Amino acid sequence: MRETDLADELFGQPGKTALPAGVRVATARQGGVTITRVEIAREGLARPRGRYVTLEVPSVSLLDERDSAVIEAAAAELRPLLPPEGPVLVLGVGNRRVTADALGPRTVQKVFVTMGPRTAPVPGIRPVAAVAPGVSAATGLSLQQLAGALVRELHPAALLCVDSLCSAEPERLGRTLQFSDTGLHPAQPDHSRHLDAARLGVPVLAAGIPTLMQAEEGRDLVVTPRDLDGVIAHGAALLGAAINRALQPKLSVAQLCWLVG
């Protein structure tokens, strides 16, 4: 099987293979969104123990932050994975200069930031900070080093990482959102990009959209959606709006879109 970051591609294929012990999969439909929840209750499987949620939507290049039904569905799945209160740091992982890898940096530009050195707490508004740390080739620091320094300085209740994902199936490209509470564990074997609670000392969540897949198993070639620019632009807006709605439930989608601009 080709590399994949999507848990439901590994465990959510009903009728193809029996589920391993300790894995539960449930699927539901909400409007035009198909939601698959994968819960892994033990270690030693293809993915770390924890909860994974994927939402299958029409191509995100056709959606944006005005699609409130999709945003509400995504926010409703992300919110239970977050701590109920406390500041959250949103980390945009990836290289903004490479389109397929730019989802994280582009998404943090859409996050409603409420923290700042001269910003007083506002009742009912959750403290949120957002940063895109760049790539190690440009900074000289690994993602783990940068994330660790930020966590030690800000003491967030949780770290939410946004990254471009890899899919094993072409029809999933630009059509799937995934959230998890297991940390950031890319399919590629670069462990300096792995972020989780054991390494950082705070809960680490991950969010993303698949933007590429291996062309052939074992070969260093990738396939991206034809409308990759649209997937990144609209996907970042959609993810940003869902993150904002999950973090700020007292504000409507319309209010949050106006505040972000």
Predicted regions and their residues:
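An N-terminal, well-structured beta->alpha segment
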Residues: 42-82
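Gly/Ser/Thr-rich loops at beta-strand to alpha-helix junctions
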Residues: 93-103, 137, 164-168
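Catalytic-core regions of hydrolytic enzymes
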Residues: 128-159, 164
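Long, charge-dense
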Residues: 106-139
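N-terminal amphipathic/basic leader segments beginning at the initiator methionine
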Residues: 1-50
